[in-house]
Every structure is written in structure tokens, then in C-alpha cells.
Amino acid sequence: MANLQERKSFSKPRISIQASGGTPEAKGIEKRKLSQKRRTLPLQLSLGGHLSPWPTYTSGQTVLHNRKPCSDDSRNRANSCQQQSMSISKPKYLEQLENYLRKELLLLDLSTDSAQELRLQPYREIFEFFIEDFKTYKPLLSSIKNAYEVMLAHQKERIRSLEPLKAKIVTMNEDCSERVLAMRAEERYEISVLKKEKMNLLKLIDKKNEEKISLQSEVAKLRRSLAEEYLRYLTERDARKILIGDLNELRYQQEDMSLAQTPGVWGEDPVKLTLALKMTRQDLTRTQMELNTMKANSGDVVPRRDLEMQEKTNMELQEQLESLKADYEEVQKEHELLLQLHMSTLKERDQFYNELQEIQRTSTPRPDWTKCESIIAGGPERWLVLAEGKNSDQLVDVLLEEIGMGLLREKDFFPGLGFGDAIPPFLRFDGPVKNKKPSKKEVVNLLKDAWKERIAEEQKEPFPDFFFNFLERRFGVNDAMAWAYTIFENIKLFRSSEIMNQFYAVLMGKNLESVYINQKKTLSHLLKELLSVDTQNEGSITMEQFSTILKTTFPLKKEEQIQELMEAVGWGPDSSNTDMLNYRSLFNEDEEGQSEPFVQRLWEQYESDKEAYLEELKQELDLDPLEDVTLLKMRGTLMNIDPTMDKQTLSAYLSQAYQIPAIDVPLEDEEKQGIISIKVETALDRLRMADTKRVGPREPDPAS
């Protein structure tokens, strides 16, 4: 009982200390009482001044031997061990500690905010007892206790620092809840308004339907009355015709009767005849006098018909004179322009002549390209094929490609470029990478397969990531990096290959992939138009039909460009419109992906048209390349040089130039358009990357 009273006295100050907020005096009292506990409690809980060795004396009995787990022997041993363990009692020291801990926990006041800290205090005291009693393990136990105390202090400090964040989160949660409730109330109000509007519209529709039904009935009634009136009119018309016929017959009968009853002419009165003759003679005399007077008065008068003819002739001559004057003035202006052009041509001729003299004086001799025949693999025959139709600059590129191909073949490994931000994602690797050494044909076929898969892909990912994923799917994860380096080095080298050059431009971000895709769509559309004309499916059409299809498919091309395309397919001065053309061969590609001259000419014209369009845009902006141009000015300039451009294309061009989503382009908000700006040079470079082209003619057709 004395021990119990003493332990109760220990527990009461603990509650008061925790509730007091932890003042220095309270902490000192707590330390003193804790030291008293440490002095008294071990004396009470020990057995004769010595600690109980439990359960150390049972350790020798708990050694496991290699036995079968399910055998009878193992079961018997397990039962005997359980009986022995149940017969062994706990040490008195351990029991007193457990009773003390249980009573201390029952005496705690857990209704306060610091209940968990109060609950931890008895365990801390028990641990202090262990530290004081077990002298051998005191350093280790003290370090464990200190580590836990430091961790608890750190956690408390962290909880205290997170309290403002918790309050802020609660406040934000309340604000968001209020906003959600407000939005829901607003939505409910809008829904009610829409429902009312819907009911009003339904009522209006019912009213209109009733009016429609009444009007239909009225129209039907009017049609019936019109039919009745028409029948009555027909009846009256027939009756009128009958009456007219009867009336004519009666009149003829009356005339016949009057002729039968009329006396002869000679039965007239002679006096009346004499008087009538006299009056007739007077009228004749008066008429002759008037005729003579008119002849005398109109002797010098010109007939009106002749006057009108002369006036008409005079007007025609006057118009011809005005036309000739205008033609003369126009010819005079053209003559002056030709004189100026002649003078400028003379100046250019002199300038070119001087430049020619300077070039002839300073330039080196023209290289003898036939020396390359013995160096290039394949001999003179292959060199003739490579050099056909190429100038010196292009021949240098061909020679560099052949030399580079040989050097590329000699390499067994490529050095890894590392993991820098400037390195493309598909080339980020550290260490040597094996050169797969594919042929040019294999690289071209691989690029074609990549384009096919890219076009068929629904969810678009960045092109470099797609390229590397494609290689992983094709060659596996282990060989994907080696193929990436190999293909990259090949497409970087073979710039004369059309498909490699385009793939390299898209891969390095110099062109958008829409340029290549739209080019293929244009060729497919042209082939479809040619197939529609070839009704017999013979694979050939006339030159005239081909020219007509080119003009309808490319309405914005000039006559000179159409003529260039015609020459690319074999049109010459001696050709006839009836000559047949095998149009299918125009779209063929060789095994290295090289297109026919017709497709190459189309691509060259596309590039030149794009450059001309961007140059016209630059001239129309009339700004320095490093100056900023607003979205408003860019939009107005695009509409000036391309008036027929639709809103979708305009949004796409502005989105590409200013790098904002097409749906976010503020076409209707001029204030926002005046805020968004970018450098002219940057905008033109971005438009040059995309499929930028003229939509319609510069000046729209007035008839359209």
C-alpha cells in the first residue's frame, strides 16, 4: 500500500506539470521527483538487491533442432516447451514495472490537447528506470533515448511550422467550397433561365404550328374557290363564244337583207352630187397651195434621217480619235519605260562585263570533273549518272557525299554525345555506339516505314521521341540507340537525297512534319485528278489534258511555272498537244528514294513560292528584322497580301508565328492583338518552318 500511495503521489504532479505549460520551476520539480522515483523504485522492485535473471535461464531450453516440422516428435517437443513456458513466471521486477505503468496510464487525464504527450511520460520514466538499473547498457540506452528525444523535438518543431500551412489550407478549402457553391448556384440559375427560354420557345413553336395549320386550311379553301371560279370562267367563255357566233350570223343576215333592199347609185340627187363636187375642188385647191408652201419652205432643209446618220458617224469618229489618243499616250509611256529599261540594261551589262573581267582575272580554272571517275566507286558509268544535270556546286556536294560515305563505312563505332540539353533526346548516350553500316537503300526504306507509321499514328508525340520509339519497336531496346546514331549520321551526310534531307529537317526542328505530309497529299491529289481523266485506265493522257489538270490543280501558279513543269515531263518545242504522256512514271522513285524531275521541280517551286510569299510579307510589314511586330499588325499584313485567306488558315499562321494555340488566337479582340508581339525575324523563321503558302490571288477577281 505504501508503494501504491507513493506512485500516486508521483503521478499527480505529472498532470499539473503538463497542464501548466512547462514552466522552468515545474520542470525542476519534475526532475527532483523523478530522481526520487529512481532512488526508491529499484529498491522496491528488486529481489534481495539482485535483478531476476528471467528469462535467461530458459535460453538453453529454447534451442531449435533440425526436426521435421510435421512429425510426431516435433509436436511432442512443442507441447513440452509450451508447458514449460507456462510454468515459468515473470520476474517480480517486470511485474511491478507493468503494474506501475498500467496504473500511471489509468491516472492520466486524456481529455486535454496534450494527451499523447502525457501518455508518453510514463513510458519515458520506465525507460529512465531501465537506464539507471542496467549500468552495462546505460550508454547504449541513453543514446537511444537521446535519439528518440531529438526526433520527437524535430517532429514537434515541424508540426508547429506546418500549423500555419494547415490553417491556410483550411481557409483555401473554405474559399473553394464557397466558390463551388456560388458556381453551382449560378449554374442552377442559368439552367432555370434556359428552361424558361425553352418553354417559351416551345410555346412559340406550338403557336407557329397552329398558324401554319390555319394557313394551310385557308390555302386549301382558296384553291377550291379558285377552281370553282376557273370552271365558271370556262363556262362563261364558251357561252360568250356562242353568243358572238350568233351575233355575227345575225349581222351577216342583216347586211344581206340591206344589200338586197339598197337602190342603185344613179338614183342619188343631182344637186347633192354637184355640191359635193364643188367642195371637193375647193379642198383640192387648198391642198395644192399648202403643198407649194411646204416645198418653198423646205428647199434648204436636210432630212432628219440624213442628219441622224451624220451625227452617228461623227460620234464613232470621235470615239476612235479618243481611243487613238489613249493608245498613243500608252505607247509613249511604254516607250519611255523601255528607254529607262534600256539604260538600266546597259548599266547592268557594263557592270556584268566588269565583274566578268574581274572574275576571269581572279578566278581559278574550272575543275576537271572527269578526274573523279577513277576515284568514285562504280567507275565512269556511275560518275556519269551522279553528275548528270548538276552544276559545280552540286557536284561538290555529290563528291563530299561519296567521300563521307566511304569514311562512314570505315567507322565501327560512333562516340556518344553525352546527356547535355543541347543534344537531341534520341542521341543522349555516353560511350561508344556501334555503327550498323546499312546501305543507302535500307536507310531510305526505314525512313519510309517511319513516315507511314507517323501518318497513321492517332496520338501525336514529339517527332524525336516518336523516332526513337519507332527504332525500339523495330530493332529492340538494346539496338535502338545504335540505329539512331547510324541513321542520324546517314541523313546528315546525304543532303542530295530528297527523303533524307526532309527527314533530317523535321527531326532537327528546321521544318514541321506538316510540310512533308501536305506535300504527299498534294501529289496524291494530283495523281487522283490524272486518274479521273484516264477513263480507259491505260496509264497515259495527252499533253493538253496534263496541262489543263496542272492549271486546275495549281490555280495560283504562273504560266512560266506551268511551262517549267511541262518541260520537266518532256515537253519541247517540237511536241504536240496530242502527244501521249505516261503520267504514272512521274511519281516513281528509285531504290534510293530519289524522285523524278517533275516531283523535284514541284518541290523547288514550292520552296521558291514560300520564300517569295515571306519576302512579300516582310516588305509589307516595313519593319527592321530585329523590331517587334504586334499580332494586330501581322494579322492586317497577312490579310493585305492574301485577301482571300480564311479565318482557320489565318489562326494557324498566327499560332505558328507567335507560338500560341490556334484556339487562343484573339482574332476579334484588337486590344489583346496589340499587346502580343515578337521580333520580325523570329516570326518569319517560324513561318518558314511551317507549310506556309498563299491561299488566293493578291487581288481577288471582281466577278467572284
From Swiss-Prot:
As recorded in UniProt, coiled-coil segments are 190-230, 304-342
**What are the GO cellular component annotations?**
cytoplasm; perinuclear region of cytoplasm
Q: Name one Pfam family in it.
A: TSNAXIP1_N
Task: Give a yes or no for keyword Cytoplasm in this entry.
Answer: yes
- On whether Cytoplasm is a keyword of this UniProt record, the answer is yes
Indicate where this protein is primarily found: cytoplasm
Q: Tell me the compartments it is located in.
A: Cytoplasm, Perinuclear region
Region of interest (Disordered), residue spans: 1-37
Q: Which GO terms describe its biological process?
A: cell differentiation; spermatogenesis
Identify the keywords attached in UniProt to this record, alphabetized: Coiled coil, Cytoplasm, Developmental protein, Differentiation, Spermatogenesis
- Tissue expression as described in the entry: Specifically expressed in testes. Predominantly detected in the post-meiotic stages of germ cells.
Q: Which domain of life is it from?
A: Eukaryota
Q: How does it assemble?
A: Interacts with TSNAX.
Q: What does this protein do?
A: Possible role in spermatogenesis.
Protein name, entry field: Translin-associated factor X-interacting protein 1
Organism field: Mus musculus
Q: What is the lineage of its organism?
A: Eukaryota, Metazoa, Chordata, Craniata, Vertebrata
